[in-house]
């Protein structure tokens, strides 16, 4: 269509400006932190949010702010109805080992580098410039096009709930650019919870697990864990050092130890990945617990918890030994991620993130796990549950988005997807994830050296512009 070709050319013209805007947004380290009444998710998240709202105002769009909890940028329509584009501006912690500054926003080698380039600042900027190009080319949408800005997608979604309670009208349909192409029509349910164990007081002398920590986010495979061990009997450290060396050689683990005062610190490095795809990571907590299982601790409670972990969780990714190995034909196997751990002399807390199939319920998952935990005398503290979504592949929304994707890529083989990831799509009735990762591209969100191709930023903006046009235009 001639009009959309004009829009595509405008997006190409805006390329430098678009990349500069993304670089500026990446430079804000918007990890959600301690907040205030005016800045609920901390200074940096609010700074990224205000920067995005200002872009909207400068482009001639109207904006709405729900008291700093979230907001939107509106491309006003001539009729009733809203088409939503739902993104987020918060990011997960950067971690270690980057080749570029994680918040440098550096443009080099054809990429924009930094935390949030793929998840989700890059796609948000591409969506914004899709709207901007349509406006610059004179498009008058029948339905209002709304870019919704979430601020705590990575940490709890309280901001989105607050926003939804205060916005006057919700989208009739839309997409979130926070997943994979071609279209994600269904998402597994999500459970996050803590397994709690209490230890009796130890008596006598021997090895004591003073502390054990690992992981930084419930929705990521932990890439680092460390334990501090004290030896009140004496003579145990040499054996631990020998065991570390043996495991490093036999299993190729990235494990090391060093003296810290009168204690010994054992550190493990794994590989981070999104919790929905634990097979792409290496769980540092599981490696460390496997190692600790080779030692004998003075406190029986400590030893029992280590044994529980290795016997019931270990390196399993699907809950096979802890009572929750559900699966279905539509969405595959449940995934189980031991995400964070905090152990001291008195207690242990293990934070778990599960993605369960669309055909089962969270209650079924909990029932199987609690039956196992009861046998150990351990408790469970339930966190927030996110219910699965399942939109028909033949629906109008999915059909329009599939047609748009195919017209830009020539990919007629890929079909609508079902995933374990949790996006803002599940907070709305008729919203699906639509990009921004193309088939065959590596998964870089939540990982070190996150980046996005400059060419893909242009392609994303063009795809999203056509999708917005088709969904928001007046009916023939």
Residue ranges and their predicted role:
Residues 64, 272-345, 355-364, 379-476:
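An extended, acidic, His-containing surface patch that forms the Zn2+-binding/catalytic region
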Residues 71-73, 227, 262-269, 350-352, ...:
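A generic structural motif
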Residues 120-200, 206, 241-245, 249-252, ...:
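Acidic/histidine-rich catalytic neighborhood of metal-dependent amide-processing enzymes
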Residues 81-149, 155, 167, 172, ...:
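Active-site metal-coordination/substrate-binding segment of hydrolases
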Residues 52, 124-134, 163, 288-291, ...:
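Buried hydrophobic packing segments
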Residues 108-110, 131-146, 239, 297-303, ...:
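Phosphate-handling active-site elements
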Residues 185-188, 192-213, 218-271, 275-336, ...:
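Acidic-enriched catalytic cores of C-N bond-cleaving enzymes acting on peptides and small amides
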Residues 1-84, 91-94, 351, 452, ...:
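N-terminal helical capping/dimerization or prosegment-like subdomains
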């Amino acid at each position: 269509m001639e009009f959309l070709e004009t829009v595509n050319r405008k997006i190409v013209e805006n390329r430098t400006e678009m990349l500069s805007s993304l670089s500026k947004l990446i430079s804000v380290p918007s990890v959600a932190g301690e907040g205030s009444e005016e800045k609920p998710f901390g200074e940096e998240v609010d700074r990224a949010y205000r920067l995005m709202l200002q872009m909207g105002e400068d482009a001639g769009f109207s904006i709405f702010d729900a008291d700093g909890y979230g907001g939107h940028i509106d491309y006003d329509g001539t009729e009733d109805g809203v088409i939503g584009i739902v993104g987020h501006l918060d990011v997960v912690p950067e971690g270690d080992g980057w080749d570029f500054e994680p918040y440098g926003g550096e443009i080099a080698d054809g990429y924009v580098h930094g935390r949030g380039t793929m998840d989700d600042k890059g796609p948000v900027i591409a969506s914004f410039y899709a709207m901007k190009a349509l406006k610059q080319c004179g498009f008058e949408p029948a339905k209002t096009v709304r870019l919704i800005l979430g601020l705590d997608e990575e940490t709890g979604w309280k901001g989105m709930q607050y926003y939804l309670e205060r916005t006057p009208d919700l989208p009739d349909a839309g997409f979130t650019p926070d997943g994979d192409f071609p279209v994600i029509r269904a998402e597994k349910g999500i459970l996050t919870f803590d397994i709690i164990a209490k230890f009796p007081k130890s008596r006598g002398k021997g090895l004591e697990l003073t502390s054990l920590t690992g992981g930084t986010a419930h929705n990521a495979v932990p890439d680092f864990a460390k334990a501090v061990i004290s030896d009140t009997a004496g003579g145990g450290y040499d054996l631990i050092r020998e065991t570390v060396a043996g495991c490093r050689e036999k299993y190729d683990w990235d494990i090391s130890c060093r003296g810290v005062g009168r204690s010994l610190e054992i550190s493990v490095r794994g590989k981070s990945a999104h919790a929905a795809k634990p097979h792409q990571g290496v769980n540092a907590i599981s490696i460390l617990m496997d190692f600790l299982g080779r030692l004998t601790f003075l406190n029986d409670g400590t030893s029992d918890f280590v044994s529980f972990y290795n016997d019931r969780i270990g390196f399993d990714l699907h809950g096979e030994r802890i009572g929750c190995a559900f699966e279905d034909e539509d969405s595959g196997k449940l995934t189980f991620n031991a995400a964070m751990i905090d152990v001291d002399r008195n207690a242990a807390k293990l934070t778990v993130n599960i993605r369960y199939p669309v055909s089962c319920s969270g209650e079924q998952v909990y029932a199987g796990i609690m039956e196992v935990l009861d046998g150990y005398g351990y408790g469970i503290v339930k966190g927030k549950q996110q219910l699965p979504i399942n939109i028909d592949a033949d629906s109008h929304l999915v059909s329009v988005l599939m047609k748009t994707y195919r017209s830009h890529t020539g990919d007629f083989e890929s079909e609508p997807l079902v995933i374990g990831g949790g996006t803002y799509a599940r907070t709305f009735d008729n919203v699906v994830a639509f990009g921004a990762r193309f088939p065959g591209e590596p998964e870089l969100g939540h990982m070190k050296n996150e980046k996005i191709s400059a060419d893909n930023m242009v392609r994303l903006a063009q795809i999203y512009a056509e999708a917005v046009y088709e969904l928001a235009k007046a009916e023939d």
